[in-house]
Amino acid sequence: MSTKTARVQAYFAVAQMNYGEDISLAQVVAVHRGAFSAQITQGSDVKGDVVVAVTLATPGNCTDHPLWPPVVGDWVALADATQNHGEAAAHAVEIMPRTSYIERPAASGFGLSQAIAANVDELVIVEPLQPAFSIGRVERFVAIAHASAIRARVVLTKADLVADQEIQGAIEQCAPLVDSVTALNTTDTQAVAGLKESFTPGDTLVLVGRSGAGKSTLTNALLGTSLATGKVRAADGKGRHTTTSRQLLQGEVNIIDTPGIRALGATPDAEAVDQTFTQIAALAEQCRYRDCSHSGEPGCAVGQALTQGDLSPEVLERYQRMRRESERNELNRDARLARQSQRAASRDNTRGRRETMRLKGRGN
């Protein structure tokens, strides 16, 4: 029995213990506005290929749960699963503990973020070689993977449109950052088959990248599905959002396809940024001052490496920019969470006072 199978069975056992024998266990495969779709795997006759519609506002949902709302990849306990004329419905009572949680920082700089997926094993960064490969975008995605404590790999698409020298240069830039780098043309069946063999069977992957990178085309090739794919403008290489919502597609590996990202903020986890720029992080430990900003301080090992030509100034610039943005996002996030906590406490106090007055016969 695999670790993942054992974990799912443990989830089901806990759900039955908490809610009774009639409970079902399902995995969220898509999230919609005000609802989500889930696929029941255990505990109900409504299972298999049937997708269950779950309305978020249904009474009994776990809206006070710390993990709420559910995201694609979540395992949820469902009650009252029914099927009528091919339409299945249920309501959620609990979100099971997550092994990982990925969120995308907004580019606004206000500490906001958007959930991408949960229970993911590997982040697959799909980066096109044409029209313009961006190592900065790759680095930001890698930092998100570190913040989520999951593996990361890079798939460089449109390799048929650039020279071998450009491909090799991109591979060399990506290789120190991730576990694996592959350059291919997504219509090359042999290359895609080789990529597919490198994935661990049963793993859940999430594909991320800019619009027009080829995420949906790659998903179709890996799973034999038929997601909509869009044309890319010749002028700037930009594509349309052919994937407009996150969805989990199941096969030998489970793939979560996501909408394209036009602008990507820095993760509010500064340590994850350091884990991405390992050369700078290692040099920083040799700096004279612990809080060295690597901006000309005496005894700065990073500055010395820069002077000696052992560190690229472009790499240092990208690191410092992302680190500053990360620290700012962390402060903004913490302030926003503190305000939310204060508002929640105020609401609870108001409810408490009203209940006390009601019990005393003074309320309405």
Region spans (language model):
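Helix-rich effector regions associated with P-loop NTPase G domains
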Residues: 3, 17-22, 41-43, 47, ...
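Short aromatic-glycine-enriched beta-strand elements
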Residues: 34-38
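Conserved Switch II/interswitch segment of TRAFAC-class P-loop GTPases
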Residues: 87, 96-103, 120-137, 160-163
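Switch/coupling subdomain of P-loop NTPase systems
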Residues: 89-91, 111, 118-120, 133-150
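Conserved beta-strand/loop subsegment of P-loop NTPase cores
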Residues: 120-126, 149-159, 179-183
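Canonical P-loop GTPase G-domain recognition
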Residues: 161-213
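Walker A/P-loop
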Residues: 216
